[in-house]
Amino acid sequence: MMSLKPDWVEYSNEEIEDLIVKLYREGNSTSKIGIILRDQHGIPSVKAVTGLKITQILEKHEMKPEYPEDLMNLIRKAVNIRDHLKEHPKDLHTRRGLQIVESKIRRLVRYYVREGVLPEGWRYDPQKAALLVK
């Protein structure tokens, strides 16, 4: 794939990959890595410069996260809402919010199973999700 590297980007593809691996080892998420590269290193888009997405670069270096970041964020949010509902069982607005978040999780899981990111038959279970997040 041809990459349209801006003239003012001073990093080579190998240097960008090394930066991504270093930032991931420091505990940064893929989205945070993109923000750091944009704001501190002047790399507007990793895909535009290298031709690969951040997750593809991590996969190439065998550092791919077990679950996609967006799914983990939604699961974390659902676990926090469940904890809130244990203390405030009559909070109906939050209960509705939990239904919406869990619906998003199920739709995203369906997509990731279809795309082969998650194994066939992977299901969202709130009890297992709490263990997964912690």
UniProtKB/Swiss-Prot annotation:
> What SMART domains does the database record attribute to this sequence?
Ribosomal_S13_N (SM01386), Ribosomal_S15 (SM01387)
Alphabetical GO biological process terms: translation
Q: Which Pfam families match?
A: Ribosomal_S13_N (PF08069), Ribosomal_S15 (PF00312)
Cite the CDD domains for this sequence. Answer: Ribosomal_S15p_S13e
Q: Which UniProt keywords apply?
A: Ribonucleoprotein, Ribosomal protein
Q: Which InterPro entries match?
A: Ribosomal_uS15 (IPR000589), Ribosomal_uS15_arc_euk (IPR023029), Ribosomal_uS15_N (IPR012606), uS15_NS1_RNA-bd_sf (IPR009068)
GO cellular component entries? cytosolic small ribosomal subunit
- Superkingdom assignment: Archaea
The cross-references to Gene3D superfamilies, in alphabetical order and at most eight, read: 4.10.860.130, S15/NS1, RNA-binding
Say yes or no: keyword Ribonucleoprotein present: yes
Q: Which PROSITE patterns match?
A: RIBOSOMAL_S15 (PS00362)
* MF-aspect GO terms: small ribosomal subunit rRNA binding; structural constituent of ribosome
What's the family? Belongs to the universal ribosomal protein uS15 family.
| Assembly mode | Part of the 30S ribosomal subunit.
NCBIfam families the UniProt entry points to: PRK08561.1 (NF006331)
Q: What is the designated name of this protein?
A: Small ribosomal subunit protein uS15
Organism of provenance:
Methanothermobacter thermautotrophicus (strain ATCC 29096 / DSM 1053 / JCM 10044 / NBRC 100330 / Delta H)
